[in-house]
Regions:
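A hydrophobic alpha-helical transmembrane-helix feature that marks the membrane cores
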Residues: 1-227
């Protein structure tokens, strides 16, 4: 029995490592593209910013389309799921540069470090807790929908305080989702007895990637209120 437990634990650790390899690759690509836009292609970025929100709007809609395509391909275990996820990561790095450009490097670094620390804590909660987090996960998803509606409303209100409260709530929501999504990785492994299709690995990596990026953006808005 001990040998079986050790084997299962080793297999689960390898499975987490595989998921997080994809997550790390996605975040790395986004950071690389965003960094290049802010340095090597800074003049082009300034030009695009001066053109208004057209390019950002186009890129945002393209991102949404890629998320749906990647999720659909992952659910069908399509070999194209991983390339689409990586393409999304590249495009997201492009759009992130539009946001990050308005903050100081110190603020961006502080937000990233804080996001990483909070992410690792909540990921550990999801990985090691024995409590079923599905109820919390569903509540966080419902709260996220409400916050997205609030963000749309605040486009017209243009309230700085309202935006701050939304950002704080977003941090709480994505912290909960990070724990839940990490628990789902373990459950997927256990329920499939370690035979999880690559498409599902990509799907879980996409969820974790989105959790981290949105957590970072929420903390960045909080830290950068005075920038």
């Amino acid at each position: 029995m001990n040998h079986i437990i050790i084997h299962d634990r080793a297999g689960l650790n390898q499975f987490y490592a595989k998921v997080y390899a994809f997550v790390g690759l996605g975040i790395g690509l986004s950071a690389l593209v965003s960094g290049l836009m802010l340095t090597v292609f800074q003049s082009q970025l300034v030009y695009l910013l001066m053109q208004g929100r057209l390019w950002l709007t186009i890129a945002t809609f393209a991102e949404l389309a890629l998320v749906f395509v990647a999720s659909s391909m992952a659910s069908r275990n399509s070999p194209a799921a991983l390339p689409v996820f990586l393409l999304y990561s590249v495009l997201n790095g492009f759009t992130l540069s539009f946001v990050v450009a308005f903050y100081t490097p110190g603020t961006v670094l502080s937000a990233f470090v804080s996001s990483a620390l909070l992410f690792f804590v909540m990921a550990a909660v999801g990985i090691f807790t024995k409590k079923d987090l599905s109820g919390i996960g569903r509540a966080m998803m419902a709260a996220l929908i409400g916050l997205l509606i609030a963000m749309v409303v605040n486009i017209f209100l243009a309230s700085g305080f309202f935006d701050y409260m939304i950002s704080v709530a977003m941090v709480l929501v994505f912290s909960g989702l990070i724990a839940w999504d990490n628990q789902k990785i373990r459950l997927a492994y256990e329920q499939s007895q370690g035979r999880v299709a690559t498409g599902w690995v990509v799907s879980m990596a996409l969820s974790i990637y989105l959790d981290f990026i949105n957590l970072f953006l929420s903390i960045l808005r909080i830290f950068g209120r005075n920038d």
